């Protein structure tokens, strides 16, 4: 059966058929690939799941706890009252010791330097231990007479060889 210009159905059904096939190619809706299925308390990747999965409390709760343990806020430290400015920082003991040592030595006018490493210093090379006597001659020989292999080319023209001859 051939299609005739006066017949209905064939040309109009072709675009519909193409649209139907295109819709069949579209994937079915599914859950987001980045969400954890284990439990609703886990966050998605968009909310840093790897960092927050181990926490049992809300991040807002532990942020409040950290803020309370840190002492006065930064705007309180700018106040002219000496008690607010001299509030101790909550640093590890070894950091506080280093800070106090640096502060005492800078008040005394002593320059502060980092401690030297326990490794012994490497000896410096002295000029007489370096031998450059044959370096210039080898360089001149390599430049003036390059290694060639005349048999490598069928035309008989010399070619640079990969190794010294």
Curated annotation (Swiss-Prot):
Instruction: Identify the tissues in which this protein is expressed.
Output: Detected in cerebrospinal fluid and urine (at protein level). Detected at high levels in the substantia nigra, fetal kidney and trachea; at lower levels in testis, uterus, ovary and placenta. Not detectable in many regions of the central nervous system. Also detected at high levels in lymphoblastic leukemia and colorectal adenocarcinoma.
Q: Cite a single Pfam family from the UniProt record.
A: NPBW
Q: Where is the composition biased (Low complexity)?
A: 113-127
Q: Which UniProt keywords apply?
A: Cleavage on pair of basic residues, Glycoprotein, Neuropeptide, Proteoglycan, Secreted, Signal
Query: Which GO BP terms apply?
Result: feeding behavior; G protein-coupled receptor signaling pathway; neuropeptide signaling pathway
Q: Which cell locations does it reside in?
A: Secreted
Assigned protein family: Belongs to the neuropeptide B/W family.
Q: Please spell out the taxonomic lineage of the organism that makes this protein.
A: Eukaryota, Metazoa, Chordata, Craniata, Vertebrata
**Broad class of where this protein is predominantly found:** secreted
Provide the propeptide boundaries: 65-165
User: Which one of the record's GO molecular function terms can you name?
Assistant: G protein-coupled receptor binding
Q: Where is this region: Disordered?
A: 106-165
For this protein, the record's PANTHER family field holds:
NEUROPEPTIDE B (PTHR28553), NEUROPEPTIDE W (PTHR28553:SF2)
Q: Which residues are glycosylated?
A: 133
Write out the function statement from the record.
Answer: Plays a regulatory role in the organization of neuroendocrine signals accessing the anterior pituitary gland. Stimulates water drinking and food intake. May play a role in the hypothalamic response to stress. NPW23 activates GPR7 and GPR8 more efficiently than NPW30.
Q: Would you tell me the protein name for this molecule?
A: Neuropeptide W
Q: Does the keyword Glycoprotein apply?
A: yes
- One Gene Ontology cellular component annotation? extracellular region
Task: Report which superkingdom the organism of origin falls in.
Answer: Eukaryota
Signal peptide positions are 1-32
């Amino acid at each position: 059966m051939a299609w005739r210009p006066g017949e209905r159905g064939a040309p109009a059904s072709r675009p519909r058929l193409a649209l139907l096939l295109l819709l069949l190619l579209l994937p079915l809706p599914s859950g987001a690939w980045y969400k954890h299925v284990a439990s609703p308390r886990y966050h998605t990747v968009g909310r840093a799941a790897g960092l927050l999965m181990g926490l049992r409390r809300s991040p807002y709760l532990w942020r409040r706890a950290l803020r309370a343990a840190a002492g006065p806020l930064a705007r309180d430290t700018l106040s002219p009252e000496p008690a607010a400015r001299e509030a101790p920082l909550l640093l590890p003991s070894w950091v506080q010791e280093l800070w106090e040592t640096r502060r005492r030595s800078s008040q005394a006018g002593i320059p502060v330097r980092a401690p030297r490493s326990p490794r012994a210093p490497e000896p410096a090379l002295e000029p007489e231990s370096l031998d450059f006597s044959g370096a210039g001659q080898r360089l001149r020989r390599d430049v003036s007479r390059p290694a060639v292999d005349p048999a490598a080319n069928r035309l008989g023209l010399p070619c640079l060889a990969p190794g010294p001859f």
